[in-house]
């Protein structure tokens, strides 16, 4: 893509939302990532590949339409919605024009920004509006995402409407995949996992990723017919015994009463447990062993 190939401002929605529509005079709180057309990053508060904040960076706030940011932002974000993630392709005349910005942005450079709208303070109001789960299609009551579960969450990571890879921290995470073929790996801690629409994969790489006690186990809240749970890293040989009792053979995996359990050493007791609320039946095809 040549330096001058962006001739007009274009906006692509990477994550849809039904949140409040943005308008001039709103104070916005956003995360962003900026790149040149060659893919070279020149500034960012957030990495939209790892879905992690950049070290030492915090969200950025500004008043929409007040000239506090480049014209491409003021024009491209007007009419978008709270909770959306949008990609702005901005021609140079709506960016910095002939002005070079340090050693990072040459003169006459079109720019690409990915922007997530985290919150909005409407003009003249005193209380900001934050994203609601329902705005991005998460029906908390239907899924069983209770206040009690949310109270355990220490970190939330929400993907795009693409094929995302979400990796939790070593704590209790809430990972939300939304649309696309997503891979969710909560890691250590009692994680809450929501794949969303699409053929999702729930990855486990250590027994400690989901513990036996109720307070330490993961919850997969929306496991669907096309989803799979990957346990291949836990042992060389695993066998699914449906709802049968553990027989004393190492590597048996069973599912009963909305609970997936693994007896890794053949002692007829589980060393790994995942809760699947609302799932009445699990097939062998749902497991990667």
Where would I find each of the regions flagged by the language model?
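Hydrophobic residues in beta-strands and at strand termini
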Residues: 13, 64-65, 90, 117, ...
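Low-complexity acidic/polar repeat-biased segments
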Residues: 136, 146-151, 155, 244-289
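Predominantly extracellular/luminal cell-surface or secreted proteins
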Residues: 35-37, 205, 232, 261-265
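Cross-family detector of peptidyl-prolyl cis-trans isomerase
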Residues: 1-158, 162
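Acidic, glycine-rich calcium-binding repeat modules characteristic of RTX/beta-roll
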Residues: 163-167, 172-241
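Residues in Ca2+-coordinating acidic/glycine-rich loops
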Residues: 159-162, 168, 266-268
